[in-house]
């Protein structure tokens, strides 16, 4: 079992993943586990500290979430955040009750006592609150470390046990010294060293791949995106002669994607590529299918069928490698009290029984870590910083049924969007940009004639790891040019709208 410096127990907060991200950014390997993980599994990870995340429940409610009480007897430092704070207070018989004044948003705190958490940090800080319950008193052995206007027990702790509790969320960017607080907990309370980096990760993963695969061969599924490209490069660095790289054209690719992928692997990466045209199979199976989850399942099942058929053509192929990320695992499964958001085609979209063993060497890291790993492996910045493209492709960017006419409309609009973003310098400033065909028609006027054509939505977002995102504040003139070109150049589209939703509550992709 892989060891972790810090274990984050998930009680359902939308920010849980950010806790792990902030620690990893500082070289400390953090891993997320469900709140009800067994004490034996925790011990097996040999952590140096534990963090209890926030969550939507109340510790005094009948449906409250509780971790194993033995966590507090392991002799490890523990940090409780929001719900985790209240859980710690509740465990030690302090009073937790509904807050008369709920706090959502920015608040100011003042440090009242020196502690490991606030070492080398200012006494007054701006933090981000998101709670409707409060701690009303402290148990023996605990003392106040910081206060806010509405929270006299905003931060408390027991320095001897190295137990600390925060009412606010240090993991979000709005807490100006939040990252430093988490770093201090890891460094001064848990004695963690900053040794986690992509160089060490690449070396460790290569060793694991060689050990697991032995003399067998691996079928590596690639899409041309950064995730699968990095997987292919990592496998090539570990077992180059045993890797068979396969690209499947599922008919759901962007304009020119197939040609770009074939060129990139052959000329940029120096990796032989088997290219399979399976567009007819995918599109026929997607005919008349409107439900997004069903689309994902069909695509996942079909991919596996094709890969298994290809594997039969090669001797000793026992494994299938995929570019599954930590975010895919989180969004496709129930982690602690968190709910499934959507099934990813390479996680929840897989059939229950497949004839190949899965290798997912990136499943422990986030997207920005994948990019850093790609550079570590020698991939070009052009490859590493391509915008993410979902495995199900354009199928989840078409609302409702997927067919060739709809795909053609979407491809043409998407080409224009990307051309305009690249020509104005906005492509490299944003995380992801694409068009969504809404399959909704509206009335328009072109010349003196009435039109009744499709509407397309532009989605451009800023993010660092894809777990959260905000819409990009593109200049009006850029948006205007994109809209004008799409309406004038793509017959069948007469309306363009811009998606100004953030994640959460929306996801980046529409389906």
Swiss-Prot record:
List, for all copies, the residue spans of the domain called GMPS ATP-PPase.
Answer: 196-386
Provide the active-site residues from the annotation: 82, 169, 171
Q: Which parts of the sequence belong to the Glutamine amidotransferase type-1 domain?
A: 5-195
Q: Which InterPro entries match?
A: Class_I_gatase-like (IPR029062), GATASE (IPR017926), GMP_synth_C (IPR001674), GMP_synth_GATase (IPR004739), GMP_synthase (IPR022955), GMPS_ATP_PPase_dom (IPR025777), NAD/GMP_synthase (IPR022310), Rossmann-like_a/b/a_fold (IPR014729)
Which GO cellular component term is one of those annotated? cytosol
Alphabetical keyword list: ATP-binding, Glutamine amidotransferase, GMP biosynthesis, Ligase, Nucleotide-binding, Purine biosynthesis
Q: Determine the domain of life of the protein's source.
A: Bacteria
Q: Give its E.C. classification number.
A: 6.3.5.2
What is the catalytic activity of this protein?
XMP + L-glutamine + ATP + H2O = GMP + L-glutamate + AMP + diphosphate + 2 H(+)
Q: In which pathway does it act?
A: Purine metabolism; GMP biosynthesis; GMP from XMP (L-Gln route): step 1/1
Keyword Ligase listed: yes
Q: Which terms does the record give in the GO molecular function aspect?
A: ATP binding; GMP synthase activity
> Which enzyme class?
ligase
Q: Does the keyword Repeat apply?
A: no
**Binding-site positions, ATP:** 223-229
Its assembly, as annotated, is: Homodimer.
**What role is this protein assigned?**
Catalyzes the synthesis of GMP from XMP.
State the name under which the record lists this protein: GMP synthase [glutamine-hydrolyzing]
Task: Recite the lineage of the species.
Answer: Bacteria, Pseudomonadati, Campylobacterota, Epsilonproteobacteria, Campylobacterales
Q: Gene behind this chain? A: guaA
